[in-house]
């Protein structure tokens, strides 16, 4: 089992990046920054790019394990950051793209339903929900 020694938010991103690599996705960028914000992960599968927003939460949370934190305003910021990322690629920017969401939670014991698990602190981080095509740039108003 993988052991992650990073702050909670970065540990969740590292877990999802490892899961992507396990699935043979190429991780192009981690924590990519521009004036509009940060892209947690940018991966590539064949010729398509995935912009993956990772939400990591402790066992209990007010926002449905991070899902409510990705509202319309956050989606607009992610869409704009993705546009900046694509612009940085130059001529290669005409590729298929999608926005995925990965939900990671901290638990004292891993659950059988977890997609990927890693030891963290005195417990475990688990990728328990992965939402492909969670939203589109058009839906976010960009």
Swiss-Prot record:
It holds the Pfam family UPF0102. InterPro entries: Restrct_endonuc-II-like, tRNA_endonuc-like_dom_sf, UPF0102_YraN-like. Gene3D superfamilies: 3.40.1350.10. One of its GO terms (molecular function) is nucleic acid binding. It comes from the Bacteria. PANTHER family: UPF0102 PROTEIN YRAN. Belongs to the UPF0102 family. This is UPF0102 protein Synpcc7942_0312.
């Amino acid at each position: 089992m993988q052991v992650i020694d990073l702050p909670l938010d970065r540990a969740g991103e590292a877990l999802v990046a490892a899961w992507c690599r396990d699935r043979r996705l190429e991780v192009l960028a981690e924590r990519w920054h521009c004036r509009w914000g940060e892209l947690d992960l940018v991966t590539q599968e064949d010729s398509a790019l995935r912009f993956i927003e990772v939400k990591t939460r402790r066992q209990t949370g007010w926002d449905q394990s991070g899902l409510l934190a990705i509202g319309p305003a956050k989606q607009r910021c992610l869409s704009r950051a993705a546009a900046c990322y694509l612009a940085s690629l130059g001529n290669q920017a005409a590729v298929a793209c999608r926005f995925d969401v990965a939900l990671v939670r901290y638990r004292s014991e891993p659950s059988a339903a977890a997609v990927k698990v890693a030891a963290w602190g005195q417990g475990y981080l688990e990728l328990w929900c992965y939402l492909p095509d969670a939203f589109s740039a058009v839906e976010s108003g960009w």
